[in-house]
Amino acid sequence: MGAYRYMQELWRKKQSDVMRFLLRVRCWQYRQLSNLHRAPRPTRPDKARRLGYKAKQGYVIYRVRVRRGGRKRPVPKGATYGKPVHHGVNQIKFARSLQSVAEERAGRHCGALRVLNSYWVGEDSTYKFFEVILIDPFHKAIRRNPDTQWITKAVHKHREMRGLTSAGKKSRGLGKGHKFHLTIGGSRRAAWKRRNTLQLHRYR
């Protein structure tokens, strides 16, 4: 087994004494920093490499802190107007994961970079911490490499805003396996529409 395999096993056993201590100390460290800052290197090099990171020019890691919990509807003094069924303010659940929110914030902050992927690095009772892998699409090392040329195309601008990253696709219900059967046909809406449309085929 290589070194990354051992690191992967360490991260799998998060309840071990070593990992509990490490995660607790790191969470304290991350809380002292700003909610979005550049990391000098990935905290989990094995995970980052599996998601496409390379230790070369053009790759950047940003660490993002996201507040945990449900979403409160931003309305003044709870005045929502309309019918009582839509009066909810406090117990609102956001449709996307906190990981996709972290990707979006990093993408907004670094508008010229492209979000490749992200991964979890820690959490406490109040916050979750994610590291986001970003790529500079104008760097020669990225543009000349056939493996990374795809992300330099204009169609991949702000892919994190449109649910095209791994975390975004999961929130949209897109994927393989029995967990994603509600989106056969492209999206949740397309699948629902097909199932609820009565088709009376003509007898010939």
UniProtKB/Swiss-Prot annotation:
Molecular function GO terms recorded: RNA binding; structural constituent of ribosome
Localization in the cell: Cytoplasm
Tell me which domain of life the UniProt entry assigns to the organism this sequence originates from.
Eukaryota
Please tell me one Gene Ontology term that the record gives under cellular component.
cytosolic large ribosomal subunit
Record-linked InterPro entries: Rbsml_eL15_core_dom_sf, Ribosomal_eL15, Ribosomal_eL15_CS, Ribosomal_uL23/eL15/eS24_sf
Q: Which UniProt keywords apply?
A: Cytoplasm, Ribonucleoprotein, Ribosomal protein
Q: Do the record's keywords include Ribosomal protein?
A: yes
List this protein's GO terms for biological process.
cytoplasmic translation
Q: Which PROSITE patterns match?
A: RIBOSOMAL_L15E
Q: What is its main location?
A: cytoplasm
The cross-references to NCBIfam families, in alphabetical order and at most eight, read: PRK04243.1
Describe its function. Component of the large ribosomal subunit. The ribosome is a large ribonucleoprotein complex responsible for the synthesis of proteins in the cell.
Q: Give the similarity note.
A: Belongs to the eukaryotic ribosomal protein eL15 family.
What is said about its interaction partners and assembly? Component of the large ribosomal subunit.
Q: What is the designated name of this protein? A: Large ribosomal subunit protein eL15
Q: What is the lineage of its organism?
A: Eukaryota, Metazoa, Chordata, Craniata, Vertebrata
